[in-house]
Amino acid sequence: MEKQHNRGQDGAGLAMVKLNIEPGNPYLHRMRSNAPQPIADLFFKIGQEIQELEKYQPDIKQHPGLMKGHLPFLGELLLGHLRYGTQGKNNVEFCHPFIKRDLMPGKNLALAGNFNLVNTDELFEQIGVNPGDFQKQSDLAAMMEVVHHYLVKEDEANPNNANITNVLKNATPIFDGGYTIGGLLGNGHSFIMRDAHGIRPAYYYINDEVIVAASERAAIRTTFNVGENEVQELMPGTALIVDDLGNYRIEKILEPKERRA
């Protein structure tokens, strides 16, 4: 996030999903900030949580499994976002990720992205939602409603194991604008998708330990100290989809169109 600081300074947010959590314990967490230095604010608060835990268990860092049970933002799936406000106010409520909660893990969704949609009214009409004042001011709110609508439908067919490819193929054809979106599901599945024109950038890197995606190739290269050819471009209209076991695939969701970026 710090290496892409230039992409947005109006706010920042994090969402975390933990895998293999005992029933009844929280597995989806979110923190957002619109402080003057939002990235620093987020990680200062997380650092405070660690320091507070160390007061009572000084050797806690030697036991990562135990730490995971005590710290909200220690987990396997992380979604970070930097806000550059193009729509809506700069209140913290407009900072990504947005989340939808449900009793079933597979219907919990955290969503963030780099985009500007021009047909939010049409999106709400598509799924029969009457938007409130807040939703009318946020294109992410419209996108979230559509994606979650089709996620719930897919979950009905495959409880807690929705086919993300089908979700995206149903949800994204009516998105009018450039976008790269990232989503985490409460069951440990995740995705990144890029618009058919390639208006917004997206890159990814995969090794034996991590699967990472970002808006800038350089941010991935410098963070993981890898060569330019090791970081791949996510092509227009495609999605990188990952399950809770780390299995991944690249799927064509939309037919690619004339490149605009």
Q: Residue locations for each model-derived region?
A:
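Conserved short alpha-helical segments that host acidic/polar catalytic motifs at enzyme active sites
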Residues: 1-261
